[in-house]
């Protein structure tokens, strides 16, 4: 047993889902509901976009998602346009779309979960790191009415310098 302490806790199941963006693109994601979730119950949700954007989420254990879910939150992880593993065509759909259609993909995943009857729309948060942090900050400025809280850490906040290499400072 590599982690015997885990059996003391009930972990939440992660399930794949497919949704359609507002402009008709078929996208994929994962939804995690709390272990004690009751059918038909509307619960607080956390939208959790991955970093990257040239990355993706995977169907497997994620300690941050489990932390949220075991405390009563539903969690949506979505592979928005530009996520890896879906081919060149989807990568091209992301060109020049940071803060635009890539951002809308996150809201569309939330609306999918709401349409399934899961979401208490008065208690939605967005949380992310790296590009996910950027997406969270975009949510704060573009759609603050959707979110009760914004959690952004180690984010990409300066797109102009995002692709610069090397040290971006000098000694005084």
Annotate each predicted stretch with a short phrase.
Residues 1-41, 63-66, 70:
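Non-catalytic accessory segments flanking enzyme active sites
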Residues 37-87, 134, 159:
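Short substrate-entry loop that stabilizes the transition state in hydrolases
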Residues 19, 29, 47, 68, ...:
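Conserved hydrophobic/aromatic pocket- or pore-lining residues that grip, position, or stack substrates
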Residues 78-172:
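Active-site-proximal cap/loop segments of hydrolase catalytic domains
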Residues 2-5, 35-37, 55-58, 112-116:
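Conserved helix-loop functional segments at active or binding sites
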Residues 12, 61, 99-102:
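Short, conserved glycine- and acidic-residue-centered signature motifs
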Residues 32, 48-49, 127:
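Short hydrophobic segments within beta-strands
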């Amino acid at each position: 047993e590599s982690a015997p302490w885990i059996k003391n806790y009930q972990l939440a199941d992660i399930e794949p889902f497919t949704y359609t963006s507002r402009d008709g693109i078929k996208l994929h994601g994962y939804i995690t509901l709390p272990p004690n979730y009751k059918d038909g119950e509307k619960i607080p949700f956390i939208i959790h976009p991955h970093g990257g954007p040239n990355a993706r989420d995977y169907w497997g254990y994620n300690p941050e998602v489990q932390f949220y879910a075991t405390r009563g939150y539903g969690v949506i992880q979505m592979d928005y346009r530009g996520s890896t593993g879906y081919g060149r065509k989807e990568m091209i759909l992301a060109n020049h779309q940071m803060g635009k259609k890539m951002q809308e993909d996150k809201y569309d995943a939330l609306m999918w979960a709401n349409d399934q009857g899961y979401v208490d729309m008065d208690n939605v948060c967005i949380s992310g790191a790296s590009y996910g942090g950027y997406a969270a900050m975009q949510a704060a400025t573009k759609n603050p009415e959707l979110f009760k809280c914004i959690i952004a850490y180690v984010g990409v906040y300066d797109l102009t310098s995002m692709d610069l290499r090397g040290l971006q400072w000098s000694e005084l």
